[in-house]
């Protein structure tokens, strides 16, 4: 599907969205998805769950229904991803802030690893995490895309720092 930030691949189960990735190359993205879910049956349809998730990329969120996620990860990863969901639109936070927020202040690097393993791009807003120095830091789908997302969200409202 198309998004303001490029092609996006969305995969869902009957429980919710399990994967959402930016896909510069369709075949490579699909092969990556097949490796992550080797026992899955794939169909090339956009269902209601996926269509609803695409509303996140519109300026009008009035049509957006609750988005259900079906995530698989370690307890630590799930805790980090849950914390990412608390960062407001237009907000930024640091790996250290997240580590403190999950009561593990020395786990900055582990937080960075968990952020990098986020399976649901944009919906779990790992792009809102920056380095303590103010630098953007790494982003799985590229620094240019991360910059564009932060700018797009900032245009929707006031930029905030912290959780």
Predicted feature residues:
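Basic nucleic-acid-binding alpha-helical/helix-turn surface characteristic of O6-alkylguanine DNA
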Residues: 1-106, 152-163
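Regulatory, non-catalytic segments
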Residues: 106-121
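Short Lys/Arg-enriched helix C-cap and helix-to-coil transition segments
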Residues: 122-129
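…primarily DNA-binding HTH/wHTH and HhH modules…
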Residues: 132-163
